[in-house]
């Protein structure tokens, strides 16, 4: 939720106060459009995220209402308590763990990753292919296990993409603060196709929303929509047999 950050940014820039603005590609593009082509952006620095898509706020609020009754003290969407690859949704209430489930077992995360309730516009995003005027782009380096397995400790590794001269200035100013090494464009894209392609809607997206509008819970709706088909079960069984024979 950008709230009034566009207006605040504009006011800061008028007073020559440096601003570092981070957000999704569409939020960065929106900021530039709001400021206008003639604005003085010399003190504006922007960082975009490699974006999978933006989930529906309604579904998130409903999920919390259905599953969390106590006051929430902290939420971590990508906790590494079980490792980087099997990141975990960790919700704490009053300082104690209330929900701690991996991305493959938590229904909210499953529904998001399978594109059941990303915003409609995300399926035809106009801000792929590095087109937002961002100075830096950051994300997870999901190609790490494939290209640099010797560096993979399952604690995660980030990508930093330098997009322009201003971004290079930022990178040069901070690069001595952390371990880094260069990789190729192909290595970036291999594990991060979201840089180039929009996420396709799940085939049961309409069914999911129909169930939600009929009063079904998020957990129930996700479970029903992502239930394996007969052929998927057959395929999974064959794969297990092949692994067992090896």
Mark where each language-model region is.
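Iron-sulfur-associated redox domains of electron-transfer enzymes in respiratory
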Residues: 1-246
């Amino acid at each position: 939720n950008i709230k009034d950050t566009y207006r605040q940014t504009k006011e800061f820039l008028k007073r020559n106060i440096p601003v570092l603005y981070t957000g999704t590609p569409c939020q960065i593009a929106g900021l530039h459009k709001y400021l206008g082509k003639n604005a003085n952006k010399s003190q504006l620095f922007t960082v975009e995220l490699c974006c999978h898509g933006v989930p529906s706020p309604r579904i998130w609020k409903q999920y919390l209402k259905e599953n969390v009754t106590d006051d929430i003290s902290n939420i971590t969407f990508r906790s590494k308590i079980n490792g980087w690859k099997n990141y975990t949704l960790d919700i704490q209430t009053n300082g104690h763990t209330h929900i701690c489930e991996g991305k493959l077992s938590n229904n909210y995360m499953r529904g998001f990753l399978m594109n059941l309730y990303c915003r409609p516009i995300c399926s035809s995003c106009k801000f792929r292919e590095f087109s937002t005027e961002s100075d830096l782009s950051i994300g997870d380096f999901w190609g790490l296990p494939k290209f640099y397995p010797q560096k993979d400790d399952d604690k995660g590794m980030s990508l930093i993409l330098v997009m322009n001269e201003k971004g290079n200035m930022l990178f040069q100013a901070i690069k001595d603060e952390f371990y880094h090494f260069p990789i190729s464009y192909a290595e970036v894209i291999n594990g991060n196709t979201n840089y180039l392609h929009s996420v396709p809607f799940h085939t049961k997206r309409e069914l999911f929303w129909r169930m939600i509008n009929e009063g079904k819970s998020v957990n129930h709706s996700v479970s029903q929509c992502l239930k394996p088909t007969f052929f998927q079960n057959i395929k999974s069984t064959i794969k297990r047999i092949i692994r067992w024979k090896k």
